[in-house]
Amino acid sequence: MNDSSLSLKKWHALSALSNTMLSLAQSGKWDELIEQEVAYVSLVEKISITPFPPGSKHIQDQAMVMLNNVLQNEMTLKTLLQERMDELHGLMAQTGKQKNVNITYGRLSGNVLFPGEINQ
């Protein structure tokens, strides 16, 4: 296999992995997405050290199309991850409020309160 086809094969793999990661995020499969992240970073590193040989304009053009796809997927993925982070932040805030309520009412358990006594 020559250098051009090896480089292009890596770009195809990156594009396919990018599509898979986007699909996982859209399906809410966050743990699986994180597992794929390691392979994604590794593949990007391999691509960065595998330049296209001179005179491979056609292959470079094909790689450019795949790069645009990967970049678009990354932008969409970033938006989905931000939405997930916001959702988790809200859940954590809600859990904190629930904990405060439980602590407050836990201190009052077993006590009979009459109107006006709670402020004393």
UniProtKB/Swiss-Prot annotation:
Subcellular location: Cytoplasm, Cytosol
Record keywords: Bacterial flagellum biogenesis, Chaperone, Cytoplasm, Repressor, Transcription, Transcription regulation
Name the UniProt record assigns to this protein: Flagellar protein FliT
Segments of this protein annotated with the region FliD binding: 59-97
Region Required for homodimerization, annotated ranges: 1-50
GO CC term, one of those recorded: cytosol
Binding partners and assembly: Homodimer. Interacts with FliD and FlhC.
InterPro entries, alphabetized: FliT
Organism encoding this protein: Enterobacter sp. (strain 638)
Pfam families: FliT
Role according to the record: Dual-function protein that regulates the transcription of class 2 flagellar operons and that also acts as an export chaperone for the filament-capping protein FliD. As a transcriptional regulator, acts as an anti-FlhDC factor; it directly binds FlhC, thus inhibiting the binding of the FlhC/FlhD complex to class 2 promoters, resulting in decreased expression of class 2 flagellar operons. As a chaperone, effects FliD transition to the membrane by preventing its premature polymerization, and by directing it to the export apparatus.
Signal peptide span: none
Protein's gene: fliT
Gene Ontology terms: biological process: bacterial-type flagellum organization; negative regulation of bacterial-type flagellum assembly; protein folding
UniProt keyword Cytoplasm, yes or no: yes
Record family assignment: Belongs to the FliT family.
Superkingdom to which the source organism belongs: Bacteria
Keyword Acetylation recorded: no
